[in-house]
Amino acid sequence: MAIGDRAMFTVLLLFIASISGFSVVRCVTDPSDVQALQVLYTSLNSPSQLTNWKNGGGDPCGESWKGITCEGSAVVTIDISDLGVSGTLGYLLSDLKSLRKLDVSGNSIHDTLPYQLPPNLTSLNLARNNLSGNLPYSISAMGSLSYMNVSGNSLTMSIGDIFADHKSLATLDLSHNNFSGDLPSSLSTVSTLSVLYVQNNQLTGSIDVLSGLPLKTLNVANNHFNGSIPKELSSIQTLIYDGNSFDNVPASPQPERPGKKETPSGSKKPKIGSEEKSSDSGKGLSGGVVTGIVFGSLFVAGIIALVLYLCLHKKKRKVRGSTRASQRSLPLSGTPEVQEQRVKSVASVADLKSSPAEKVTVDRVMKNGSISRIRSPITASQYTVSSLQVATNSFSQENIIGEGSLGRVYRAEFPNGKIMAIKKIDNAALSLQEEDNFLEAVSNMSRLRHPNIVPLAGYCTEHGQRLLVYEYVGNGNLDDTLHTNDDRSMNLTWNARVKVALGTAKALEYLHEVCLPSIVHRNFKSANILLDEELNPHLSDSGLAALTPNTERQVSTQVVGSFGYSAPEFALSGIYTVKSDVYTFGVVMLELLTGRKPLDSSRTRAEQSLVRWATPQLHDIDALSKMVDPSLNGMYPAKSLSRFADIIALCIQPEPEFRPPMSEVVQQLVRLVQRASVVKRRSSDDTGFSYRTPEHEHVDISF
């Protein structure tokens, strides 16, 4: 018996030990999650409220970081609501691949939303902060969202057509912001939406897109909506619509006691077509009470109307003043239509009350009438010259990995093993004004956050130097990959080429249409598209155009190395806009299609200019097949090739006004990717390019 007990005890100890060992292993948090949380903690100014959080190291799952919930080694919930933290959301939230719930509501978080958010969220709550800018396009890919709340911020511009793929969204709260424009048409496709709050914005147009939704609660109060309220909305349990200009505002039924449940903002109106039931419906109200309620309501309504009139009158005066100031500070580049849009957008932003900690750029009008720009805080790290000298071996020739119009780029290895890329700007390339504006440009570049843009990590201004520190992307650039005679071009399959085109298109879309004011790249070329190990593209030199001289003579000197990419309007007048970037993007797409350089003096005269040679052939199926890069070995789908050529033709049109915006280019490339599947094509001397191949030759390796 004793032996049996001892054996049983031994087995029990082994079981406990195994369980303990398992729990220890389970507590080791995924390294990418740890890094993302560390960046978030630093971006929030390392607040003491986040107990157990660390700037470096640590184990969020094993050490019970405040607000963090894990499943195994993955972080699935971040709930740091109502803790009074401030700062920004950082730039690595998208690395939290397993995160399902993010709640940072009720804090003082400011700045713009990160362009990339955790992709698999089911619940997103950013309410009651000081967030500005617009909703990032990446929300369109977050198809698992069932709850989204960004209310009580300072978000601006249009909401964006970002809900087409949201098949689970039940609650959407965009209220108490400064959104403008019409409701996005993609809202009509959200068949699961039951609660929608958009009150207290600057929205316009009709609400017809909501007519087919299964809404139970809808609040559109205090906007600029017009037209008719669709009769389909009569089944909504709670409808709040006052403060607009609807044509068919229904008459109110007999006064009744308000229910216990209150909805956010706006006065509650009975639902259209039927009466609301009071919880005490069996108890009648006397005539005197009804009369008192009516007169009391009229008195309160009169006071509210007077207050609203005074507020609106004051607001209009502020908007007029801020619009005039904003117009003076806008860049002169771009079409008149773009400039007009910027005036409207900046005016609406200027009217908002920003917290002192917000990173905004303000134009101060001096007594002499000039404008002094107050620079935003710089989010990038500041380096010393000595540390950069050590990391680059005193900027030795062996460390040079590139050279551009503003200076050379060096590979830098720091003592901790971190590898970075250092751009050493040649001060001779800058005028005095550009030197003075260097820190302002650094501030703007440090805030660019996009997965396809090389991030600025730091800078140095010691001893008159101008040095920029970038994240290192170590797999070369697209120019070398396409145009050098080695195995790298063989690895660039058709799918990879479309992937590069889509990624860089999204980067330009971000610069042109997400950033405010728009950022013109002005040096977009294959040599500035860096590739990582998975052939994801990363656009370099974004924002550097602010440092280049502004005169036509100087600009021509700066981009002489990019000849072959230049848009016709730039060659004629020196004018460069976002539409010029679209043109150069089309040239890069031609490189991806043909494998040829934009200018190649080794070819016959008729084929030296890629654009001139290729343009007449883009809509000729037979000619198109002969243009394709031979290194693809016929491995591409014919329809995808044709659509790719159609996009190129749009981008390289001679007239800039006919070129599409980058958002349209992105949409077309996304559709191309969705339809794409690689089909092996055969080419022979007798039949030429084969657009029909036997069934056994189909290879399904679509995106």
Curated annotation (Swiss-Prot):
Residues spanning the membrane: 292-312
Region: Disordered, residue numbers: 247-284
Alphabetic keyword roster: ATP-binding, Glycoprotein, Leucine-rich repeat, Membrane, Nucleotide-binding, Receptor, Repeat, Signal, Transmembrane, Transmembrane helix
Tissue-by-tissue expression: Expressed in seedlings, roots, stems, leaves, flowers and siliques.
Disruption phenotype: No visible phenotype.
Residue intervals annotated with topology Extracellular: 28-291
InterPro entries: Kinase-like_dom_sf, Leu-rich_rpt, LRR_dom_sf, LRR_N_plant-typ, PRK1-6/SRF4-like, Prot_kinase_dom, Ser-Thr/Tyr_kinase_cat_dom
Start and stop residues of the LRR repeats: 96-120, 122-142, 143-165, 166-190, 192-212, 213-233, 234-256
Domain Protein kinase: 395-672
Cytoplasmic side: 313-703
Highest taxon of source: Eukaryota
Protein location: Membrane
Classification via Pfam families: LRR_1, LRR_6, LRR_8, LRRNT_2, PK_Tyr_Ser-Thr
Membrane topology: Single-pass membrane protein
Signal peptide limits: 1-27
This protein's GO CC annotations: plasma membrane
Disulfide bond positions: none
Residues annotated as glycosylated: N120, N130, N149, N178, N226
Chain positions recorded as ATP binding sites: I401, G402, E403, G404, S405, L406, G407, R408, V409, K423
Gene Ontology molecular functions: ATP binding; protein kinase activity
UniProt comment concerning the protein's domains: The protein kinase domain is predicted to be catalytically inactive.
PANTHER family: LEUCINE-RICH REPEAT RECEPTOR-LIKE PROTEIN KINASE PXC1, PROTEIN STRUBBELIG-RECEPTOR FAMILY 8 ISOFORM X1
UniProt similarity note: Belongs to the protein kinase superfamily. Ser/Thr protein kinase family.
General remark: Cannot functionally replace STRUBBELIG. Over-expression of SRF8 may lead to seedling lethality in both cv. Landsberg and cv. Columbia.
Protein name: Protein STRUBBELIG-RECEPTOR FAMILY 8
Protein species of origin: Arabidopsis thaliana (Mouse-ear cress)
